Amino acid sequence: MTHVLVRRQGQGKKRRWDVNMTMCFFLFFFVFYVSFQIVLSSSASVGYSRLHLVASPPPPPPRKALRYSTAPFRGPLSRDDIYGDDKRVVHTGPNPLHN
């Protein structure tokens, strides 16, 4: 007795269609999940908190307020006292060719 397997015409196509739909569903779910994670991570980043949650820094003071008062400095009255006897000596390092 010989057994002959008879395949119906529409059964193979339906199974293939079910597999394709399942794969499309999981692919869509995966893309949706990844994009949702990207949105969540970008909203929790420093840029979002700086723009939305943290108060902005105070504005800079006006231009005239930036000047600082300094104590007056006066050097010696004669220019010869600045260097003293050492004014004509050329200081060189270990190699006199490289000043």
From Swiss-Prot:
The modification Hydroxyproline is found at P94. Glycans are attached at P94. Residues 77-99 are annotated as: Disordered. One of its GO terms (cellular component) is apoplast. Residues 1-21 form the signal peptide. Residues 77-89 have a biased composition (Basic and acidic residues). Keywords: Developmental protein, Differentiation, Glycoprotein, Hydroxylation, Secreted, Signal. The keyword Signal applies. One of its GO terms (biological process) is maintenance of root meristem identity. Belongs to the CLV3/ESR signal peptide family. This is CLAVATA3/ESR (CLE)-related protein 17. It comes from Arabidopsis thaliana.
